[in-house]
A protein has these predicted regions:
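Register-specific beta-strand positions within repetitive beta-rich fiber domains
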Residues: 1-13
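Glycine-anchored, exposed beta-strand/edge motif detector
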Residues: 10-146
Length: 146
């Protein structure tokens, strides 16, 4: 259910749907950004110095600060929606439920195996709530392996 914009001018609660109803959907805090390259649903991005969203990569600290996930196919230099925090569903995922989800050494990708190479960056991006769903909650603290 899309509720559109909801101004928060009074004390109340904001609920997140724990089970998005369809493949490649989400529920949570969303923002619009400009893609710096072609993106697809589920690819995680950092914000470059240009202000554009680029695929995050755990191979180097300079490209590892994932903060958003693309919520659709977004062409380079086009505006699109990204989730900052919430629940995302992709039926192609096959997570181990309850396991942590990390930034991958493949640009834009997620993994349940923490990167282990020299200079790789370990960043927790969330936890698997179901085989096809994750709680997306990117951590700002990162560890660079030496």
């Amino acid at each position: 259910m899309d509720m559109g914009e909801l101004p928060l001018r009074a004390v109340g609660t904001v609920g997140l749907t724990a089970a998005p109803s369809a493949d490649v959907t989400s529920s949570g805090i969303i923002t619009a950004l400009t893609a710096g390259e072609n993106l697809v649903f589920g690819e995680v991005c950092y914000i470059a110095s240009t202000g554009k969203a680029l695929k995050a990569d755990a191979d180097a600290i300079a490209t590892s600060s994932a903060i958003v996930m693309a919520l659709a196919t977004i062409a380079a230099d086009a505006s699109g929606n990204f989730i900052l925090h919430g629940i995302a569903r992709n039926d192609a995922w096959a997570w181990t439920v309850g396991g942590l989800i990390y930034l991958s050494t493949t640009a834009g990708a997620l993994t349940q195996t923490a990167p282990s190479g020299t200079d790789d960056v370990v960043q927790i991006l969330g936890v698997a709530t179901h085989a096809d769903r994750m709680y997306f909650n990117p951590q700002l603290v990162q560890v660079e392996r030496v």
